[in-house]
């Protein structure tokens, strides 16, 4: 006997977010999830696993507040920035009444999280330069409680212009929260809007330890906001969101030595990104390599499925973005080690475009 008649209708209709791990693959070079390619060297410092953890462990909160340049009371730590996306929806959106707004092509969890909670989704596609269409957004703001903007944007890799973000804050004042997803900001920290929190009470920032901190497996993220927002989020967060081992390693990552290691990784990845970008520009099967300030590159291929399968068959796994608006024949390539980048370049230099007579 099926139990589907007991399930919520919107969950039955839900198309789940397909993470890199759910999509799977058999490879030895994983360039599909924007992870750091090598594990960091943190170890557990042990103890007291018989006790429940603190809801908001002081060492983690204080460490991240100091790193981000905010007060501890402006920080919530959660199970990845994905949980931050959900906490905001749970705290601010009424199912069946309110909506969120986002601007594809962008990160898929804004849509999935809203649909899971029965919140309407409004989209305003980005312009051809992947900047925001302010006029179109203004026309769709009625009933919107949360606007999610990813900067640097995943998967395109570009920053949203600061003047555009400021215009969005003025536009949403008194109407909605503007949530700036800065999951990749550690690769370009000068572009953060964290210093604007004092000026805009409706600004919210999402952060993570998954990217530059090389801790994707830890599932540790942060919401930065003004105290009034933080207090509401603490009403709906789980009582023990961070396991003791997670808090232990996160605190180590936010130490002076942990921050030094993170900045070394950022410099390495930024250098490897330029190496990969220059190498791909010379590959006949690559039509465009788009500028990026993050730990991945978006490339347009001739055609994407052939480039994807060629690398897949050789054990290198990328992320196909072709179904996103405006990204036909586009693949996203995570920046790996120098050797991994050179391997991708070597394979693709030998691959002719489908339009080439030599490839027939």
Swiss-Prot record:
Its EC number is 2.6.1.9. One of its GO terms (molecular function) is pyridoxal phosphate binding. One of its GO terms (biological process) is L-histidine biosynthetic process. It is an enzyme of class 2 (transferase). Pfam families: Aminotran_1_2. InterPro entries: Aminotrans_II_pyridoxalP_BS, Aminotransferase_I/II_large, HisP_aminotrans, PyrdxlP-dep_Trfase, PyrdxlP-dep_Trfase_major, PyrdxlP-dep_Trfase_small. It catalyses: L-histidinol phosphate + 2-oxoglutarate = 3-(imidazol-4-yl)-2-oxopropyl phosphate + L-glutamate. The modification N6-(pyridoxal phosphate)lysine is found at residue 211. Pathway: Amino-acid biosynthesis; L-histidine biosynthesis; L-histidine from 5-phospho-alpha-D-ribose 1-diphosphate: step 7/9. Keywords: Amino-acid biosynthesis, Aminotransferase, Histidine biosynthesis, Pyridoxal phosphate, Transferase. The keyword Translocase does not apply. Its cofactor is pyridoxal 5'-phosphate. Belongs to the class-II pyridoxal-phosphate-dependent aminotransferase family. Histidinol-phosphate aminotransferase subfamily. Homodimer. This is Histidinol-phosphate aminotransferase. It comes from Sodalis glossinidius (strain morsitans).
